[in-house]
């Protein structure tokens, strides 16, 4: 339930998160691709989805902000299958923030997906990284990314159409 990606380009990190979120939550996949028309896709495209939260850890890195996020975890998604939390620049979180995330990462609710984006994997505690699939977007090919995501979704028993992952 956690994907960690590294890329120097913020656009790559955020685009990947949006594409995956739409692929996971689209109600009307068209030949395996998000329709970009259903409520879920439209809300993600407009940046107004309650079920897709983007957090900038560079400015919201403290324990109080992390606890605030964790308080929302038990609530089911409002209009999507999954609630997705994108924490960009995750390596900026404090030690206390990482520790508070650990229990949720160890026992994630079935309706929650975390996406951690960073420029520096080495700054993330090993206890956190060991619970995430790690994708280095600086050197990954599209085919390699699709293959890795297919493995993860299969392992996590997340239903998907492989063609939805073909970027």
Describe each model-derived feature in a short phrase.
Residues 12, 35-41:
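Short cysteine clusters
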Residues 21-33, 44-47:
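Post-Walker A helix-loop "phosphate-sensing" segment adjacent to the P-loop in P-loop NTPases
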């Amino acid at each position: 339930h956690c994907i960690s990606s590294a890329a120097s380009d913020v656009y790559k990190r955020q685009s990947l998160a949006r594409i995956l979120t739409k692929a996971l939550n689209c109600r009307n996949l068209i030949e395996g691709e998000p329709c970009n028309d259903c409520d879920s896709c439209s809300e993600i495209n407009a940046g107004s989805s309650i079920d897709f939260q983007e957090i900038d850890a560079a400015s919201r890195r403290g324990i109080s902000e992390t606890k605030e996020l964790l308080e929302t975890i038990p609530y089911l998604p409002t209009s999507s299958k999954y609630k997705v939390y994108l924490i960009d620049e995750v390596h900026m979180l404090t030690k206390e923030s990482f520790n508070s995330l650990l229990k949720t990462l160890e026992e994630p609710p079935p309706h929650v997906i975390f996406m951690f984006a960073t420029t520096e994997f080495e700054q993330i505690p090993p206890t956190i990284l060991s619970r995430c699939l790690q994708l280095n977007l600086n050197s990954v090919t599209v085919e390699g990314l699709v293959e890795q995501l297919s493995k993860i979704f299969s392992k996590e028993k997340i239903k998907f159409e492989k063609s939805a992952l073909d970027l």
